[in-house]
Design a protein with these regions (language model features):
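Short, flexible helix-coil linker/hinge segments at the edges of structured domains or between repeats
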Residues: 1-22, 74
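Walker A (P-loop) phosphate-binding motif
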Residues: 12-64
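Gly-rich Lys/Arg/Thr-decorated short loops/hinges at beta-loop-alpha junctions or inter-strand turns
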Residues: 24-28, 81-89, 140-142
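A short secondary-structure junction signal
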Residues: 39-43, 69-70, 128-130
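N-terminal phosphate/diphosphate-binding loop that engages ATP/GTP or pyrophosphate donors
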Residues: 47-92, 161-163, 175, 183-191
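NTP-binding/hydrolysis catalytic cores, primarily Walker-type P-loop NTPases
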Residues: 197-227
């Protein structure tokens, strides 16, 4: 890559921005903590979607200023990417998180992708705004699928419980280091009744599962060749 001068924000964040995803399916990647495998999972899902012929736009909604994650999304095939620093925010909070998410969802959807994938940096419990975002009824209403990244089966159990009981969200899949071995996968599937795939060893299975949950399994790989 060739570096370019850093600039925070190409436009100001509107805290009253409306949300309109124009019917585009949305996949959210949440985690039990930082470094739980969210970016790896998002990248694997994006790569599989591109392989299947889908046009994918992606963004990172929360965390601290670091473009590495969205560069990974681009390397995996995302057409357009954004991060909260594009809106002048260098560290997200409970106040800015929902507005940032609405703004980036709306902007991504305006390009009419087949699907939007976004990562919620930090864990479900933290100070960067993830909890605030997942409490917003309008944002929850547009989430077609939520994938949970967890470091171990105990974290997976707690994360699934939080999503279900605190936020009223049913995760479609668990990934992350908790799925690094067959024992972890079996525990998640049997004790939590949630599908589990590893983003590193089974990226195609992870991506295909999410695509099926979105109802986009009919898209033909030949679409890529036609672009």
């Amino acid at each position: 890559r060739i570096g370019v001068p850093a600039k925070v924000g190409y436009k100001a964040l509107n805290y009253d921005a409306p949300l309109d995803v124009r019917g585009v399916p949305v996949v959210a990647l949440a985690g039990t903590c930082m470094e739980a495998g969210k970016t790896a999972a998002a990248s694997a899902i994006i790569a599989r979607m591109r392989h299947r012929g889908l046009v994918v736009d992606a963004f990172k909604a929360t965390g601290v200023s670091l473009r590495r994650d969205i560069l990974a999304f681009e390397d995996s095939g995302a057409r357009h990417t954004m991060i909260f620093t594009d809106l002048g925010v260098v560290t997200t909070t409970a106040k800015s998180g929902p507005a940032l998410t609405r703004t980036m969802l709306t902007e991504m959807a305006s390009g009419q992708p087949d699907v939007i994938v976004f990562e919620l940096g930090d864990g479900l419990l933290g100070t960067y705004g993830v909890e605030s975002i997942l409490r917003q009824p309008d944002i929850k209403a547009v989430l077609t699928a939520v994938a949970l990244s967890a470091n171990d089966p105990v974290a997976a159990w707690g994360g699934v419980k939080l999503l279900r009981e605190r936020f009223g969200i049913e995760p479609c899949v668990v990934t992350g280091p908790a799925t690094d071995n067959a024992v972890g996968v079996e525990i998640i599937r049997e004790q939590m009744n949630v599908e589990a795939f590893n983003a590193i060893s089974s990226p195609a299975d992870l991506g295909d599962h999410v695509i099926t949950r979105l109802g986009l399994g009919h898209v033909r790989e030949s679409k890529v060749a036609a672009e």
